[in-house]
Swiss-Prot record:
Any Gene Ontology CC annotation: mitochondrial matrix
SUPFAM superfamilies xref list: Nucleotidyltransferase (SSF81301)
Region spans: Disordered: 53-77
Role according to the record: Required for normal mitochondrial ribosome function and mitochondrial translation. May play a role in ribosome biogenesis by preventing premature association of the 28S and 39S ribosomal subunits. Interacts with mitochondrial ribosomal protein uL14m (MRPL14), probably blocking formation of intersubunit bridge B8, preventing association of the 28S and 39S ribosomal subunits. Addition to isolated mitochondrial ribosomal subunits partially inhibits translation, probably by interfering with the association of the 28S and 39S ribosomal subunits and the formation of functional ribosomes.
GO biological process: negative regulation of mitochondrial translation; ribosomal large subunit biogenesis
Name of the featured protein: Mitochondrial assembly of ribosomal large subunit protein 1
A Pfam entry, by short name: RsfS
Gene Ontology MF term list: mitochondrial large ribosomal subunit binding
């Protein structure tokens, strides 16, 4: 290294090329040395990290500078999904991120053969419910594997209740008053208990039960009992 060498002088050509590349846009994409340069100098990081830019893109679509580079390069490939999975932890995290209230997760017994997890959440308004569903579905499509089932949405035209079936998870998003009316939590967690309770007859006192009497008077006639 000569006496005039400095890190700034070494990095200046790279910064200049990067600025030219950003200004030129798609025209520079065909230059063969650019991918090698990016591969050499850009730090490696997990492609599945939910960075603010990725979250912003999922909410509002690609930014103007991203759209100019072509939609084909924005499509995620199989390598982009390594390490990320749309499971119950991811679902609950996204619901909390979208300010869902009173999240309830119920693990469904396997013998029911319906789903693995039954999730219930509340929204503050109809718009909030639809926004949460839209975001969940968008994230699922972004992270899903080819073998994962398609999403099924029920209640698209409803104002107070939407249901999304992800296959291994089913989520119900409702307004608080609707949730209080149907009480799905009790239906899925206390159903056997409620069925047994419904079979019990109304409470009645047995014929041989007399409140507050300790002595055995079963052998006495009504007249003798009254005199005693």
């Amino acid at each position: 290294m000569g006496p005039g060498w400095s890190p700034a002088r070494r990095l200046w050509p790279l910064l200049w090329r990067r600025a030219v590349f950003q200004r030129a846009g798609p025209a520079m994409a065909s230059v063969p040395w650019l991918p090698r340069l990016a591969e050499r100098w850009l730090p490696a990081r997990p492609a599945t990290c939910l960075t603010p830019s990725l979250t912003r893109g999922l909410h509002h679509g690609p930014q103007p500078e991203e759209r100019t580079a072509g939609d084909a390069r924005l499509q995620p490939g199989p390598a982009d999904h390594i390490g990320a999975k749309f499971d119950i932890d991811m679902l609950v995290s996204l619901l909390r991120q979208e300010n869902a209230r009173d999240i309830c997760v119920i693990q469904v017994p396997p013998e029911m053969r319906y789903t693995d997890y039954f999730v219930i959440g509340s929204g503050t308004s109809t718009r909030h419910l639809h926004a949460m569903v839209h975001y969940l579905v968008k994230m699922y499509k972004h992270l899903k594997c080819r073998s994962d089932p398609y999403v099924k949405i029920e209640g698209k035209d409803a104002d107070d209740w939407l249901c999304v079936d992800f296959g291994s998870m089913v989520i119900h998003l409702m307004l608080p008053e609707t949730r209080e009316t149907y009480e799905l939590e009790k239906l899925w967690t206390l159903r056997s208990f409620d069925d047994q309770l419904a079979q019990i007859a109304a409470e009645t006192l047995p014929e041989d039960f007399i409140l507050g009497l300790e002595d055995d008077t079963s052998s006495l006639t009504p007249v003798e009992f009254k005199c005693k």
